[in-house]
Each structure stands twice: as structure tokens, then as C-alpha cells.
Amino acid sequence: MEKIVLLLAIVSLVKSDQICIGYHANNSTEQVDTIMEKNVTVTHAQDILEKTHNGKLCDLDGVKPLILRDCSVAGWLLGNPMCDEFINVPEWSYIVEKANPANDLCYPGDFNDYEELKHLLSRINHFEKIQIIPKSSWSNHEASSGVSSACPYNGKSSFFRNVVWLIKKDNAYPTIKRSYNNTNQEDLLILWGIHHPNDAAEQTKLYQNPTTYISVGTSTLNQRLVPKIATRSKVNGQSGRMEFFWTILKPNDAINFESNGNFIAPEYAYKIVKKGDSAIMKSELEYGNCNTKCQTPMGAINSSMPFHNIHPLTIGECPKYVKSNRLVLATGLRNTPQRERRRKKRGLFGAIAGFIEGGWQGMVDGWYGYHHSNEQGSGYAADKESTQKAIDGVTNKVNSIINKMNTQFEAVGREFNNLERRIENLNKKMEDGFLDVWTYNAELLVLMENERTLDFHDSNVKNLYDKVRLQLRDNAKELGNGCFEFYHKCDNECMESVKNGTYDYPQYSEEARLNREEISGVKLESMGTYQILSIYSTVASSLALAIMVAGLSLWMCSNGSLQCRIC
């Protein structure tokens, strides 16, 4: 009879109504890293490292770049005859120069403070070329004879378009005294130069005067140049050299020139009509007839991600460059789908928050929720409130990270002349150091946020579990795997009240108490039976052992192996 009662109790327990708290799982193979773990599979993740580009030069926010093709910046500004297509250029967003442009200084020489001029151009978006000293105004000097085979045009000798190489006229080179007053409202970029002949014979042949000078003065500039006559190797067929200079002439300031030879005078100047963020980018790419917000020498980036690893030099509203190969933010939960064999052994699921072992692929409309089973059937239901709060929290966090990082950030290269190599090396080391710091910060940020996100989901599941536990109290039994077994019948309406937090504990407490006492009684009676069996088994085992010992002793005494004395 006791066995029948025990069996009925067990059957009753198996058929008891249950409700379980669980979380979503899917077929995702996305993996993230955290502070504590690597390659954690999650249900949802968001890549925040841009690794692709289009391989083209594009307009930046609708403004075309100035692509100099085979011309250098110096060739463009001075007016190399092979750069005539750039005589007048519209507004540009950035300037593109090849690493080794063919059309540079056609007449060999040097451009003074060239790197500083390029740096200035990185803050300019538009020039307007204006004539300041007409070529026709040099009546006492030859203004058209200053040409060279080093600067050919249509098979003939020519010269830079924007400056004038002044030669003697009628065996005389009268001293030049010229001024230009900047009456414009904008700054002016003015260029001039000096010719360094190969020998004294060339000096007098071109300028008549054996000893010459050039003086240039503004409110901030005081310069005096003298030609350096020396025998040199030929470059572009020329043993002579030219050296070019530049200055920015402010409004209402005047520039004064004085020279008695070797003077390369300005004819045109550049009015700086628009300043803004620009850059000179070294690239061999072609124009792609496209638009972007971020340009690199490798191609354009169209991305809302906060980081990229394409190229450290950028122009526009760009993600920050890092040296990382992978930055993935966890937005979902740990993805550990429940296995069928575990379901048979441990119930419906098993431990995201320390006590649930696997997620539910059957629950597709939320991150956290319930699985119930009763006489009316079973099913999954997401907890919409906790899921929505979690989605909002994770979304806000991801957006916050992107907004903080995805600000306008320009990293343009700095050029240094040959005398500044140590500064250039130091600059590169500093930039590499900054990139290392950015990379470390980005990777650490992702690891920490992923850890927090997964802990956040764990906490939400635990909170949902506690919400149910506090409602049910002793009306149900905790099974230790995220499930509760009711001590009373719980139909679908009852299950729904548990899910929405309106469960009426007093309504079911009496039924639960009676069932709880009945189950406890069955356990006690079963325990009494097991205790009797235990005592009987112990006594029987001891008696059998005593008989075996006595028999062994008698056998040993009979064959002399053991001496027996009875006192």
C-alpha cells in the first residue's frame, strides 16, 4: 500500500504545473571578447570597426577635390606650362598630389618653406588668381625672353606662367623698384624668385651687372637675396638654379621689390577667398565621380562606425583610425541554445545567471520570457517590458559610443624639409604613440562594454526570476534550474497573472498548503519504510560478518595455524 501511495505521489509531481524563466537563443555564430573571456558566442552583435573603402577619390560633402594629376603643388602655383589645366580652379574640398609628380619645378631649383606653404593650403578651399604686376609693365627689361628649354610648351622653350623672368634690355638692367598695395579684403599669396647662374659669364650675359641683389619688404618681411654663382651638374639640361619664395600679404599692407638683376618677378597672386578644413593628400587614385563624408588615400569611407583601420591619414567626418583588426560590440545575450538531451535530464533549460544552462530558440519575440506547462498545454511568451528596457539600454549605449567617437577628426600628413628630419622622426613617433593609445583605448572600451552588456542581461534574467519567486512564495517549489513547480493547479489565466505581476497569492495558498502537506506526509511514510529496511540490512550484514570470522577462526585452530587457549 505504501508503494502505491509513493508511486501516485511521484506521478502527481511529474504532472504538476510549471513555469520557467528563460532567455532567447538563436543560430547566431557571432562572437565577442570580454575582459574575462574570448570568443563568446552571442545572439546579436554590432561591428564598430570599418574595414572597407571604395578605392576611389570622391567629392567631400558635394565639393570636388583638386586632383593635380601629374602636377605638384609647386608646379600648379608657379604655373608649370604642363599644368595649364589648373590655371583657374574652382573651390576644392581637398588637394590630391601624387607621391612623385612629373611636372614639378621644370627649371631645377628649390621652393623655400615649401612644407609650410602646403600646411597653409590645408586650411584653404579656394583661390582667386589676380594680376598684380602686368608683364607688359616691364618696359625697361625683357619680360618675354626669360624662357628655358627645361620648361617646354608645344615643342618650344617656355617658363612658369605666374612669374616673369626679367632679362637685361639693350645691355642694361636698370634697378627695379616696384610696390603693390593689397587693397583687397582678403589675404594674398605672392610668389617670387631668384636665379642662381652657373658662372660669371652667364651672370653678365643675362643681367649685365656682375653683382646683384633682390630686396623684398612688407610690414612683417625684410628679405635681401644675392645670387649664388657656382658650377653645378646639369638637371633638365640646366646648370643654373632657381629659388622661389612666398609670403602672405595682409589687406592694406604693401610689398616692395628692389633689384638690379636675377629677379623673377610676380605677375599673378592668389587671393584667398575661402578658408576651411582641407588637406593635401598623397594618392595615386583616380576620381570616382562619387560623394563621401570621409576620404583616405586608399579610398572613400561611407560608414557610421566609430572606428576604422584603413589608413591613418583622413579628411572629413571620419571614424577614428585604430590598428585593430576586430572590434565587435555585444548587443544581445550569450548564445547557448538548449540541447535536447539536457532538456530531458534537467528540465526546460539550465544557467545564464548562474542557474540557467541554455537559451530557448522557441522564444523569438523577446530577449527574456517564460515557458509554462499545465493541463491546457505549454508555450513560450516573451516578457515585453524587460526586453524593451534592455533593448533601449543597449541601443542607447551603442549610440553613445558611436556619437562620442564619430566626431570630425582629421589626420593629415605633415611634411618636413631635409633639415627637419629629426623633427619628422619625432613627429612620427608621437603619431604612432597616439595611434597605439587610441587602439588600446578602443579595444579596452569594447572589452569592458561587452562584459557589462552580458552582465546586464544576466541581471535582467535574475530580476525576472526574483519577480516570479516573490509572487509565488511557498505556493510553488523552486526546482533550481530556473523553474517553479506549483503546489496548486495553475491554468492559463493563472499563468498570465504570474507573467504580468498580478498573481493572487491568497487565492491559491490554501490549495497549495494542502498539497504541500500531502507531499510531505508521503515523504515521511516513505522515509520510515526506508529506515526499517536500512536497520534490517545493517543487522543482517553484521551477523553474516561475525559468522564468517568465527568459522575462519575454528578452521585455523583445527589445522594448527592458530593456537586457541580457553582460560
UniProtKB/Swiss-Prot annotation:
Residues 17-531 are extracellular. A lipid is attached at residues 557, 564, 567 (S-palmitoyl cysteine). Glycans are attached at residues 26-27, 39, 181, 302, 500. One of its GO terms (cellular component) is virion membrane. The record marks 346-347 as: Cleavage. The chain crosses the membrane at residues 532-552. InterPro entries: Capsid_hemagglutn, Hemagglutn_HA1_a/b_dom_sf, Hemagglutn_influenz_A, Hemagglutn_influenz_A/B. It is a single-pass type I membrane protein. GO terms for biological process: clathrin-dependent endocytosis of virus by host cell; fusion of virus membrane with host endosome membrane; fusion of virus membrane with host plasma membrane; virion attachment to host cell. Its main location: virion. Belongs to the influenza viruses hemagglutinin family. Homotrimer of disulfide-linked HA1-HA2. Major glycoprotein, comprises over 80% of the envelope proteins present in virus particle. Binds to sialic acid-containing receptors on the cell surface, bringing about the attachment of the virus particle to the cell. This attachment induces virion internalization either through clathrin-dependent endocytosis or through clathrin- and caveolin-independent pathway. Plays a major role in the determination of host range restriction and virulence. Class I viral fusion protein. Responsible for penetration of the virus into the cell cytoplasm by mediating the fusion of the membrane of the endocytosed virus particle with the endosomal membrane. This is Hemagglutinin. It comes from Influenza A virus (strain A/Silky Chicken/Hong Kong/YU100/2002 H5N1 genotype X3).
